[in-house]
């Protein structure tokens, strides 16, 4: 189950990544590379991480016209990443185009990357969604709507908060992948995320993957923090 624990490499550049990964010599991690790091270092950071034996969730949240997204996904698949994402708000045609691009770009003999869609950012509250985005549904209804659209479009799952996982299991079934950021140890600050949960709570609610950043990356001892999160996520009593 440790391979379903994704560590967010929210660093400004490769030097900071190298310093962080020094704590994990011999560990094969599942890491998330987001916009900040990828836009700074480019595909070279993916090559570096792959050479270290790590799995990669390339978190770029594509949202554009279908043809552009298809072409972009073709390029991303050629990097041999393991997971990618789009914004569900881009619509069904865009999401279907994303899958087409991944199939065309995947490396020979390999499966295409897992493709998931962002429903609502974990920094979004229901009040913000209604007042600023103009969606009149409840947050749970909006997330369920996007999740259903995502499944119908042929994607593997969604990014959502842990709070929405039980509802999505009802709507989309148990095989539908749920990737949940906003994971914190009970002693940590929530920072800029609104809908957060502990690793234990994420497990209880049925998340497929959890994404953990600051609780590990900002810890005094990142490896020990990683082990603590892993134990809580896997339900190990120590």
UniProtKB/Swiss-Prot annotation:
Keyword list, A-Z: Decarboxylase, Lyase, Pyrimidine biosynthesis
Pathway(s) annotated for this protein in UniProt: Pyrimidine metabolism; UMP biosynthesis via de novo pathway; UMP from orotate: step 2/2
GO biological process, one term: 'de novo' UMP biosynthetic process
Residues at the catalytic site: 61
Record's catalysed reaction(s): orotidine 5'-phosphate + H(+) = UMP + CO2
Residues holding substrate: 10, 32, 59-68, 122, 184, 193, 213-214
Function: Catalyzes the decarboxylation of orotidine 5'-monophosphate (OMP) to uridine 5'-monophosphate (UMP).
Protein name, as recorded: Orotidine 5'-phosphate decarboxylase
Taxonomic source organism: Bacillus mycoides (strain KBAB4) (Bacillus weihenstephanensis)
Gene: pyrF
């Amino acid at each position: 189950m440790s391979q379903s624990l994704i560590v967010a490499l929210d660093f400004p550049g490769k030097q900071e990544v190298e310093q962080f990964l020094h704590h994990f010599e011999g560990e094969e991690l599942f890491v998330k590379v987001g916009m900040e790091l990828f836009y700074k270092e480019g595909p070279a950071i993916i090559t570096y991480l792959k050479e270290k034996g790590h799995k990669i969730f390339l978190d770029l949240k594509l949202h554009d016209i279908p043809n552009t997204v298809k072409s972009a996904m073709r390029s991303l698949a050629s990097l041999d990443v393991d997971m990618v994402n789009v914004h569900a708000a881009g619509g069904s045609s865009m999401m279907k185009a994303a899958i087409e691009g991944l199939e065309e770009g995947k490396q020979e003999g390999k499966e295409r990357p897992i493709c998931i869609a962002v429903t609502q950012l974990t920094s979004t509250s229901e009040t913000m969604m209604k007042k600023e985005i103009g969606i009149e549904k409840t947050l749970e209804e909006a997330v369920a709507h996007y999740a259903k659209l995502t499944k119908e479009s042929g994607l593997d799952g969604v990014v959502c908060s842990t709070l929405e996982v039980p509802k999505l299991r009802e709507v989309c079934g148990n095989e539908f992948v749920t990737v949940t950021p906003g994971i914190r140890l009970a002693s940590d600050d929530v920072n800029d995320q609104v809908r957060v949960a502990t690793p234990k709570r994420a497990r209880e609610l049925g998340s497929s993957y959890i994404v953990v950043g600051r609780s590990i990356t900002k810890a005094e001892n990142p490896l020990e923090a990683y082990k603590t999160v892993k134990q809580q996520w896997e339900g190990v009593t120590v």
